[in-house]
Amino acid sequence: MASVGGTLRGNGYLWGKKSINQVKLLSMKPTLFVLAAGMGSRYGGLKQIDGLGPHGETIMDYSIYDAIRAGFGKVVFVIRRDFEQAFREKIVSKYDRLIPVELVFQSVDKIPYSYKVPEERTKPWGTNHAVMMGEEVIHEPFAVINADDFYGRESFEALADFLRSVEGKE
């Protein structure tokens, strides 16, 4: 959408230099997009749902707590279907009453229509592919984190501040 004052462009009226869509984006809380579909092959299991804190907290628990306190308004997890039930029980059940939570699934065959999946391909396509899985549920500024990395409170505050300050661009 072009940002030209005083004219109608794209799908929203412009207010000065900001469109209605941009004003809506500025008032939205950012979304936290968590990459949690890892195979855990070196670890030997699903490290993203294994507890390590004094009360069984996962690394994700610390990140989500910090993100909520920083002002994030929704959490979207990208996971694999084969551990959906365990993930819902261990992770989603903790947060779905505190903040909107969405699950999206990474699948090797969910790719842009102009591409063809090689028959021998069994593994997902990586980080960019995982982020593409969120396109139908994320309509606001968002930050992407790994489920098994610790970032700290200050990182989420900086991310949220930045995402709230960004004008919507299409």
Locations of regions flagged by a protein language model:
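Acidic, Ala/Val/Gly-enriched low-complexity intrinsically disordered segments
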Residues: A2-V4, V23
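Conserved catalytic-core motifs of eukaryotic protein kinase domains, centered on the activation segment
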Residues: G45-L46
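Conserved donor-nucleotide/metal-binding helix-loop-beta segment in metal-dependent transferases, i.e.
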Residues: E154-E170
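Conserved N-terminal catalytic core of the sugar/cofactor nucleotidyltransferase
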Residues: I20-V34, G40, P54-V144, Y151, ...
